[in-house]
Amino acid sequence: MLRFGRPNVEKLEGKRDVVGLTRVLSSTPQVELRTQALHALTRLGELDLVIGALGDGAAEVRAEAARALGENRDMQAELPLVLALRDHDWHVRSAAAEALGRLGDTEAEEPLLAEFGDSNSHVRAAVAEALGRLGDARAEVPLVRQLCEGDRLVRAKAAEALGQIGDRQAIEPLLAALSDEDAYVRESAARAVGCLRDAKAIDPLLTLLTDPDSSVRAQAAESLGKVGDARALGPLVEALGDRRYDVCRMAARSLARLGWRPGCNEYGARYYLALHMIDRAVEMGGCVVKPLVTVLLEDDSHSMRAAAARALGEIGDERALGPLIACLNNSGVPEVVRMAAAEALGAIGDSSALRPLRTALLDHDPEVRDTAKQALDQINVRLGWPGAAVKSGSR
């Protein structure tokens, strides 16, 4: 088979040709093909052959074999994976540690703990993550040591692992880690104290709601909801006005968890918007325009931005004209948002939108062009100028 050109791994897998795939894995010089054969054998359930690939000459194949064994959770792989912790390549050692965590056998804890002495921080981080998956409280002291002494990646993974283990005795070192110089560590520690649900974390988490890093602020907001203390209500309401929408969303979810009832004001509007309940927000009237504009311009969800645009069109407030026009004529804005902006401008019906809509008749997307034409027709009819849109687009 291999003498007559490049082997077709997909075809071999379709035929369930284990012999052919084994030949590719053992004899083909191309690492990419050996890796493909490895994955095919994994899908076919030939895990003994996958275990054998831990001895492949290429570190990439060995690491992929370790990952595959972890994902399949075959306990026969435990000893070979423990041996792979001594591999000369750190990618393989890291993959083996992750896989042992996925197997879930606490017997692997001792060899994993020994790897905290590994010279590579990625391996030590993988060990911490694996120990968190195993969830054995015996790992707590070594993890606390890594939290206090390791580099940033190891500190972060140690914090997350302590949260997964869930022993409240770890609360003090985790609280200290909330003040870590590194944002990733602060975020991981905030997630961990949320898992522990200890009221001691309330004040430090409230402080993190003003952290310069938005990921830290978002995680603090989420963890405050998990801890479940009413002292967090006021600060979480303030967090609804955060300039980053991921923070707003987490604050809204935590407020819902704490049973907060929104009022008919801008914070209430932001609450509904963050939970993607735009219809409820629109019912509030004029106070919703500013937060809707924020969603239109900043949200990371294209569908959410489009929904905000349509809601602004439904409200019909002229304050939305500038932001809607900016979205319509910006080719970097997703097509679905540009279409919704055109639709909203047509619904508002202000003559200041005529020129931007005519410009949109030249948009590279046909659906945007069609929506712009419909919006122009809508405005022109409203102004008593029927047919003007067609003429403007026929130049």
Regions found by a protein language model. Name each.
Residues 1-49, 53, 58-61, 68-69, ...:
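N-terminal segments that cap or nucleate solenoid repeat domains
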Residues 5-8, 34-37, 65, 96, ...:
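Conserved hydrophobic register position within alpha-solenoid helical repeats
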Residues 11, 40-43, 68-71, 99-102, ...:
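Core register positions within helices of long alpha-helical scaffolds
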Residues 14-26, 44-55, 74-86, 105-117, ...:
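Amphipathic alpha-helical scaffolding segments comprising HEAT/armadillo-like alpha-solenoid repeats
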Residues 29-30, 57-58, 88-89, 119-120, ...:
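Short inter-helical turns and helix N-cap capping residues of alpha-solenoid HEAT/ARM repeat scaffolds
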Residues 52, 57-72, 78-103, 109-114, ...:
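A generic tandem-repeat structural signature
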Residues 69, 84, 93, 100, ...:
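TPR/Sel1-like alpha-solenoid repeat signature
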